[in-house]
């Protein structure tokens, strides 16, 4: 499996979550996961982690070349607590036939409302634009997730519909076409 370079932001390092890392998380082998990612991982795992890992492990097993597009751990280098994972961000897959990618992100509760999502989403959009010329983005969120909708609004996303997700239930669908850095 190729090594995928990290993406640096002013406050964080976005470290690609490799297949071995995700397999270690799925086994709840936190020691192995921490060794592989180079940071402490939360001991309290989100409720939807198993579902996320199931899909991403299958994706990377079948399509190893997808790794740069998929999940990245948001790593904070905290002078007091050391390097630790405080969330994740990534695309659901490489671009579709129209050149669009769908983004997803999750921030640990204690780090929400501090601009983390905005910073890491911007960094991932800039990477997709700089490395692959991507200017069309999609996102889906629960109707109740006002904070996530606020992040999307900052990037000029508009709601284009809704959908029923077999796992998450009703989701609002947002799109942003023609995105460029600083737009």
Report each predicted region and the residues it spans.
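Short Gly/Pro-enriched loop/turn and capping motifs at secondary-structure junctions
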Residues: 110-112, 145
């Amino acid at each position: 499996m190729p090594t995928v370079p990290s993406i640096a932001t002013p406050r964080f390092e976005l470290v690609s979550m490799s297949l071995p890392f995700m397999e270690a998380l799925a086994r709840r082998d936190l020691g192995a996961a921490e060794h592989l990612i180079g940071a402490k991982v939360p001991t309290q795992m989100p409720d939807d982690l198993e579902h996320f890992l199931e899909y991403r492990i299958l994706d990377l097993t079948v399509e190893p070349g997808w790794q740069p597009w998929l999940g990245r751990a948001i790593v904070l280098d905290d002078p007091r607590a050391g390097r630790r994972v405080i969330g994740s961000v990534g695309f659901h897959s490489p671009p579709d036939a129209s050149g669009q990618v769908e983004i997803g992100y999750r921030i640990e509760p204690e780090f929400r409302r501090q601009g983390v999502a905005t910073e890491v989403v911007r960094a991932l959009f800039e990477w997709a634009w700089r490395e692959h010329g991507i200017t069309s983005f999609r996102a889906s969120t629960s109707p109740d997730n006002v904070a996530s909708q606020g992040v999307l609004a900052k990037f000029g996303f508009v709601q284009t519909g809704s959908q029923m997700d077999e796992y998450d239930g009703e989701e609002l669908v947002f799109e942003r076409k023609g995105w460029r850095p600083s737009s």
